[in-house]
């Protein structure tokens, strides 16, 4: 008889209260009417009800809803994507305006089937949002675009307020966790983004609970700082379906608090760490606090 798989029980601190008020329902209806996708829904984010119903924010996912990769932690659909929708940038910009966002996050599925990795549509979405929403800060969260410098330059030339690219996991686990991605290529992507536009903050996220050690987490912090990453987020990995990688450990909130302090001591201008933290969670607060910390640091250096 086959041995039944053992699963780590989800702790109480990961239980959340769902809030599906009229704001949440209205935003969901608008997304469907405009044929837009959000990573909040596609990736089964645990914070969707707080962000949509309480904070009235969302992370737009462009370039369709089918990814060319099949990472073992991610719930986004995989397969052969549809053709590009060239009207998508304007629909995103209009939705940002209707929602009255002060900070918009734009992410995308990986489009390894496209020569430019989708960089052209990504850049046009940034420009479209800025034209209609001049006071809205814009954060972009692209794939590694297969490490293509020209594609990254296309995106950086659009001048987003933050370039976010997630390292996702520690070096040792990357081959098992991230399909068609490498740890070193992600670091290089972040380094090159900073070299192209030194004044644009860079950001990366690490999910933990996949079997990494504390030393490996700290090593990842050091690697990100060595490549001039400014902002870091650390969150608990949650298994989206039984087909995905199992959770090896649920970290206690106190452990996240300790990791945050370590990250800040390494020189990150901001670190958000907690069981339910995701790359885009409270992103508006992250960019504001990071700017304040950086200005204070520059002022101290001059004195």
From Swiss-Prot:
Domain of life, source organism: Bacteria
CDD domains documented for this protein: Radical_SAM (cd01335)
Annotated [4Fe-4S] cluster 1 binding sites: 40, 45, 51, 280
UniProt KW Translocase keyword: no
Pathway named in the protein's UniProt entry: Protein modification; protein lipoylation via endogenous pathway; protein N(6)-(lipoyl)lysine from octanoyl-[acyl-carrier-protein]
Keyword Transmembrane: no
Compartment annotation: Cytoplasm
GO molecular function: 4 iron, 4 sulfur cluster binding; lipoate synthase activity; metal ion binding
Entry note: cofactor: Binds 2 [4Fe-4S] clusters per subunit. One cluster is coordinated with 3 cysteines and an exchangeable S-adenosyl-L-methionine.
Entry's family note: Belongs to the radical SAM superfamily. Lipoyl synthase family.
Protein name listed in UniProt: Lipoyl synthase
Organism: Halalkalibacterium halodurans (strain ATCC BAA-125 / DSM 18197 / FERM 7344 / JCM 9153 / C-125) (Bacillus halodurans)
